[in-house]
Amino acid sequence: DALFEAASHINMRMIAGKVMMDRNAPDYLLDTAESSYHQSKELIERWHKNGRLLYAITPRFAPTSSPEQMAMAQRLKEEYPDTWVHTHLCENKDEIAWVKSLYPDHDGYLDVYHQYGLTGKNCVFAHCVHLEEKEWDRLSETKSSIAFCPTSNLYLGSGLFNLKKAWQKKVKVGMGTDIGAGTTFNMLQTLNEAYKVLQLQGYRLSAYEAFYLATLGGAKSLGLDDLIGNFLPGKEADFVVMEPTATPLQQLRYDNSVSLVDKLFVMMTLGDDRSIYRTYVDGRLVYERN
């Protein structure tokens, strides 16, 4: 409630949800299948489509939800089909083996979510670092999306996300920070780390592609590209104004860059919180740097 209230106060476009987790975590963090269903249902009724707010059914990930809780998540999705679904998928190899041991009757990690009706449009899966070929195909077939979280994947040593494969399979991708599991909430630094992840795989991430992932690509992965993601007339005015020369090093590199793509590359590799000059939410100024 507190998160939704804070977002509502500034009329933010936000998708959020209560984490569902009834096993394999500290006792003080656990709920139950029944309590998670009822608490989520109350939040959906109170906040989903309240102003610009939207709700995501959020099992933390398959290992921390019992089959009974997964069934409750499925029930919520069936009762509220216009909600979103968000969870983790194939982040690291030990996690994948763990899922297979907990759900031996399922054909892999993604199949757990799929059999509980938790794939499809408006279903966003974080990480997806170690997907099997059949899982890539299923994400594509169901029109599910991926949140690419480079700072988290690098910090935890999870592996390297294969963006080229996602494009080949026509799977939508947006940028993510994995909340606090990465090393920054700043999108410029997230793009900087994404560049390194892809460079290690021989894939050169251009500045245009990077900023697409952080804007319209993210909007498309959320199914909100009719509302946000660029400056087309009629869209909601959520944007930041950035200063490309916020530090002496940025100034030096910027002054020696000729093309727009080079200037954007400087911003995405050297920029950070200091680059954010103003933030607008639905056309209203909500932050201005001193």
Where are the regions that the model predicts?
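Catalytic core of soluble alpha/beta enzymes
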Residues: E91-C123, C128-S144, L154-W167, G182-F185, ...
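C-terminal cap of metal-dependent C-N hydrolases
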Residues: E236-N290
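Metal-coordinating catalytic core of metallo-dependent amide/deamination hydrolases
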Residues: A2-C128
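Divalent metal-coordination and catalytic microenvironments
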Residues: A7, I57, H88, F125, ...
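Short, acidic/turn-prone active-site loops that include or flank metal/cofactor-
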Residues: V19-D22, P150-L154, I179-A181
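His/Asp/Glu-enriched, well-ordered alpha-helical/loop segment
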Residues: Q115-N122, L163-L252
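Glycine- and other small-residue-rich loops at beta-strand/loop junctions that grip anionic moieties
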Residues: T58-A62, C128, Y155, T177-T183, ...
